[in-house]
Amino acid sequence: MESIKRKKRLSFEILYEDKFVIVIDKPAGLLTTHTKLWGRAAREEQMTAENCLNDYLRKGQAKSRLRVWLVHRLDRETSGVMMFAKSEEVSEFFRSDWNRLTAKTYVARVEGVIAEDSGAFESFLKEDADGYKVRSVPEGTNRAKKARTKWRVLSRAKNYTVVEVDLKSGRKNQIRVHFSESGHPVVGDVKYGANKASRLFLHAKTLAFSHPANGRKMEFSSNSPF
């Protein structure tokens, strides 16, 4: 009964939980984890999905060492399905070969009307020196990482297109950068050249993965809020 009550007090839904992983439906506006600018004490008080889950697992016991471990991240303004590990070993299991062990699809509303019904972007991405933005750079650039984004059109309107995106790699801001550089930034993505909107129109729709204990394929989904 206690765990049920605590789930209701969370600001998001727990989609699945066992002794190895915990899968949530993250709302837009919630940080995945703390920012580097905060000290340790402040980081523990910062409102993040990670801290909320730590509190949930500890059930109010201040001396408890139960915690979650990062496996991947969603940008603060991106909503949808994401997973945390319940041990360092499970975290390392996924992070050692994330792209092979998982599959992710997103839904995005992008500015303008895309004429093609489907396509793919491929480039090498690199963070700027301050880490704030990411951009495509020539192959062979130091610290650049290859990124591939496959997409298909779901619907079109007068001023925007809704696309389903299949990530073939998981780089920082990958979807946002690739669509911005194509001339169709994600609606609301002011950081990458879009007009201001009520939110960033990017949602992690599904996450599938091989379970770390038995290899069984598991898949979780979240309805798009737009």
Task: State what each model feature region is.
Residues 1-133, 138-148, 156-157:
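RNA pseudouridine synthases
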Residues 23, 74, 106, 134-138, ...:
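N-terminal hydrophobic or amphipathic segments with adjacent small-residue motifs
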Residues 1-21, 30-33, 145, 158, ...:
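Pseudouridine synthases involved in rRNA/tRNA modification
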Residues 111, 165-168:
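A structural micro-motif recognizing beta-strand termini
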Residues 151:
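Long C-terminal interaction/binding lobes of large macromolecular proteins
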